[in-house]
Design a protein with these regions (language model features):
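Basic, Lys/Arg-enriched alpha-helical interface segments
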Residues: 1-36, 68, 76-82
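Enriched for short, Lys/Arg-rich terminal
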Residues: 41-45, 49-82
Length: 82
């Protein structure tokens, strides 16, 4: 159900508060300003950045999205933080 999906998502996001570096480092999306990490929340992937004491969730996308679509989406969402 939608509630179960939300609860799982919420628990994973809250776990980032305790361990922000638990996600997998995504070197293809990282640059000198941002270290992008991702969590696999099947069938979705959550892309995020730790910046100071904040966690910026840049995208939540279905795992079948093309690498180009993921790159464009994540980069576009991080533009406002540059």
């Amino acid at each position: 159900t939608a509630r179960k999906v939300f609860d799982k998502f919420d628990a994973n996001v809250n776990s980032l508060l305790r361990n922000p570096n638990r996600g997998i480092l995504d070197s293809d999306l990282s640059d000198s300003q941002f270290t992008v990490r991702h969590l696999q929340l099947f069938p979705n992937v959550l892309y995020y950045v730790v910046k100071g004491d904040s966690i910026i969730i840049s995208a939540v996308m279905h795992y079948k999205q093309s690498p180009q679509t993921v790159y464009k989406t994540v980069m576009r969402s991080l533009e406002r933080y540059r």
